A protein has these predicted regions:
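Conserved catalytic palm subdomain of right-hand nucleotidyl-transferase polymerases, strongest
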Residues: 45-53, 101-111, 149-192
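Intrinsically disordered, low-complexity regions enriched in proline, serine, glycine
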Residues: 51, 70, 103, 132, ...
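Active-site-adjacent bridging/hinge elements
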Residues: 87-102, 129-131, 213-225
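Conserved polymerase palm-domain catalytic core
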Residues: 176-225
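Electropositive, glycine- and tryptophan-enriched low-complexity nucleic-acid-binding patches
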Residues: 120-121, 128-142, 224
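Surface-exposed loop/turn segments and immediately adjacent short secondary-structure elements
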Residues: 1-104, 110, 114-118, 135
């Protein structure tokens, strides 16, 4: 059991999510052009992760970076096993309003290896192709080309129609911190039901197995959790 940033995290080590799995039927190999695209899309001026490699190094290395990272990503793609360094994060609590000593008054950012972001972006792009087919038009959160204005326009249209036909209308606004409360095993089941290839789900599953993190509230970091 570990207490991180005021929230208790408990993992049952007999849970299936802890065991690395391998799928025999693989999706098509990762291309060098995909690695190049991922490198070019990584935001610069970001703090390095635990490996200390700055993101600004990649443009300097150019084609050499593409070739090396393509080899690493392809190895992960085939074996479905991630380097442990890519499973490590550094949590930095950022105070919001109120007492900064209260964990609930802080938001957390996670620093990860910039090299790992290449593989993550490629995996995200492949998953997005399947997810976009399943999501309804009203789902705007975390979708490219959609945002608050898109939802406001939808609400305006709904209100207009309700008034036109003299219908009652009710709105329920919920703001819940649910991103870290998702049951992973249920998530894998849902992805399978959505038609996501087992290979992609396996990569995600093995990424989240044996995750490690340190908390850096100031100049010093805690031991790995």
């Amino acid at each position: 059991m570990a207490r991180i940033h005021g929230r208790t995290i408990q993992k049952d080590h007999n849970d299936a999510d802890d065991h690395d799995s391998v799928i025999a039927h693989l999706e098509p190999d990762i291309l060098e052009c995909e690695v190049k695209w991922a490198l070019e899309s990584i935001t610069t001026n970001k703090v390095s992760g635990g490996d200390g490699i700055p993101v600004e190094l990649f443009p300097v290395l150019k084609d050499d970076a593409v070739k090396v990272l393509h080899s690493i990503c392809q190895q992960i793609w085939k074996t479905q096993q991630w380097p442990q360094d890519w499973k490590r994060s550094i949590f930095i609590p950022i105070p919001k309003k109120g007492n900064a000593n209260e964990c609930s008054n802080c938001r957390t950012i996670a620093l990860i290896s910039h090299a790992s972001k290449v593989m993550l972006k490629i995996l995200q792009a492949k998953l997005q192709q399947y997810v976009n087919r399943e999501l309804p038009d009203v789902q705007a959160g975390f979708r490219k080309g959609r945002g608050t204005r898109y939802q406001i326009a939808n609400i305006h249209q709904i209100i207009t129609k309700a008034r036109e036909f003299q219908k009652n209308i009710y709105f329920c606004f919920i703001d819940a911190k649910a991103f870290d409360c998702v049951d992973h095993n249920k998530l894998w089941t849902i992805l399978k039901e959505m038609g996501i290839p087992d290979h992609l789900t396996c990569l995600l599953r093995n990424l989240y197995a044996s995750q490690e993190a340190t908390v850096r509230p100031g100049l010093f970091a805690t031991r790995g959790l």
